[in-house]
């Protein structure tokens, strides 16, 4: 069984030799939780661009071909998935990968879910399961190269936090299926096993169109209006347990916890855009929300031509 959507499903991911887990984040990155509204199952119209086009099927997870709002066609293209999907195994609590060599590959899909080519990574630009659950890879080809050979255009990572109650689609390349629902608030602290995430995206529940499963880990969360990536799918409560692996819980301000069996979550991706200098990740930039490694880090990633 492939890894679930997130770090949850750690056991399942471990069987595959994939990475998956949750991790603590600095208190400065914590966001105020928002209570879920009364959830009524709802039908969300799926837009054409919210299909499987520009998603990337990995051997253990889902992923997508992405770009920053400021990326140029001559920049090296990027692959986005979960930190727990890292090919080297689970990242430990406290671990941050920066500019690490990688040779993983994936199948780039069209809107119908058919493979239109193979993409190859050269390095992990950034990956962590501390406070967030993300892995961003640099690929061998530029956006222009990929567009020329396959016709695929990368999804744009939004530079702002998604709006509560906004309609979303979650295209899973692993399963060739798109889930649709809406955002139902944000969780200041979401805990699962040894890991903690902040400002997590809570999906509308109950909603049969948004029951993400193992293998949907790393799927982009696409806003149905802007058609931009506003988050990344990563976990859900399987059994109704509190704060255990595959059973994330919401931690309230007073320290009490709540958990709902079947409730699914995603993580923020606009954080990447708070850390860009000259179109490269700069963890030292003021206001950067991404978790920093223990040692100082200099900018890395695709550079904007001067």
Residue ranges and their predicted role:
Residues 26-50, 281-306:
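Composition-driven, intrinsically disordered low-complexity tracts enriched in small residues
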Residues 48-53, 162-171:
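Short coil-to-beta transition motif at edge beta-strands of beta-rich domains
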Residues 58-60, 74-76, 80, 101, ...:
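Extracytoplasmic
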Residues 45, 50-52, 57-61, 144-153, ...:
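Active-site region of chymotrypsin-like
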Residues 1-32:
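Secretory targeting and sorting signals
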Residues 35-53, 57, 67-71, 87, ...:
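Conserved catalytic-core segment of clan PA serine endopeptidases
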Residues 70-71, 77-81, 223-230:
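Short, glycine-anchored, charge-dense loop/turn motifs used at functional sites
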Residues 114-123, 164-167, 176-194:
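Beta-strand/loop subdomains of soluble extracytoplasmic proteins
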């Amino acid at each position: 069984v492939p890894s679930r959507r997130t770090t949850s499903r750690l056991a399942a991911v471990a069987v595959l030799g994939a990475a998956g887990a949750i991790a603590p984040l600095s208190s400065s990155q914590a966001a105020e939780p928002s209570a879920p509204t009364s959830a009524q199952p709802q039908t969300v119209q799926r837009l054409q661009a919210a299909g499987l086009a520009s998603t990337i099927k990995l051997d253990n997870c889902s992923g997508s071909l992405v770009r920053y709002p400021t990326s140029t066609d001559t920049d090296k293209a990027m692959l986005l998935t979960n930190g727990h999907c890292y090919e080297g195994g689970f990242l430990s609590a406290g671990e941050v990968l920066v500019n690490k060599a990688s040779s993983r590959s994936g199948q780039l899909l069209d809107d119908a879910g058919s493979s239109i080519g193979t993409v190859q990574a050269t390095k992990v630009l950034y990956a962590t399961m501390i406070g967030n659950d993300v892995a961003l890879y640099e690929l061998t080809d530029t956006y222009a190269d990929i567009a020329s050979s396959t016709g695929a255009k990368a999804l744009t990572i939004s530079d702002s936090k998604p709006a509560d109650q906004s309609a979303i689609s979650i295209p899973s390349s692993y399963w060739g299926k798109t889930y649709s629902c809406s955002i139902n608030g944000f969780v200041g602290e979401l805990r699962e096993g040894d890991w903690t995430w902040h400002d997590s995206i809570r999906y509308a529940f109950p909603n049969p169109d948004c029951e993400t499963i193992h293998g949907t880990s790393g799927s982009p969360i696409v806003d149905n209006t802007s058609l931009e990536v506003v988050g990344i799918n990563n976990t859900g409560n399987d059994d109704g347990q509190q704060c255990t692996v595959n059973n994330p819980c919401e931690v309230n301000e007073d320290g009490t916890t709540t958990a709902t069996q079947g409730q699914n979550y995603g993580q923020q991706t606009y954080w990447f855009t708070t850390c860009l200098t000259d179109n490269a990740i700069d963890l030292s930039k003021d206001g950067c929300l991404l978790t920093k490694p223990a040692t100082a880090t200099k900018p890395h990633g695709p550079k904007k031509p001067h």
